[in-house]
């Protein structure tokens, strides 16, 4: 995680390498839900996280906590679905390798609550906090291929913001994943995900928001109903 938190005009730099990420993550959770009918689908992707850290200076101690909520809702359409190779016959079913491509549009809701606590050696403690929320429109693409019955790979990415209303000037997200089918209805996966956005706005003491680049490995499971 790297970026800048701006609260009432006060800017604090954030730079947390992956090996230190668990030390500053106070809580975190991700959830993805998708419903599909033929080529159409709708999906929800949610991230809840609370990050925090502290540093001691010669004249002042600094404590930073950032509560982050990111929810996106998208609707998409499958533009490509093609069989790859010959069918594979199993004892109870026949399976066909496929390559697929989906396109989608949606909206991503950001809510960040940075709290900065300044504790000088001389004088009173000072706490600066704000709440910044906005919705970014976005459009994107997702592709997936079956390498075998067990192994699948997928890529997805989107761009958004575009400076529409209160939206960020530009935001983007990309992810690559490899999955293993445990059964016809259960898949486990691992991958890498990057999310970059800038919600800083205003001038002087009214300048608030967060500019953040989050990236790192992801692991999870998928269940088909």
Task: Set out the residue ranges of the language-model regions.
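Outer-membrane beta-barrel translocator domains and adjoining extracellular loop/strand segments
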Residues: 2-9, 54-59, 87-88, 113-123, ...
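Residues that define the transmembrane beta-barrel architecture of outer-membrane proteins
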Residues: 25-29, 65-71, 99, 131-137, ...
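Residues on the lipid-exposed face of transmembrane beta-strands in outer-membrane beta-barrel proteins
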Residues: 31-37, 73-77, 105-107, 139-145, ...
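Repeated loop/turn-to-beta-strand initiation elements of outer-membrane beta-barrel proteins
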Residues: 39-42, 82-84, 149-153, 184-188
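Outer-membrane pore/translocation modules
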Residues: 47-135
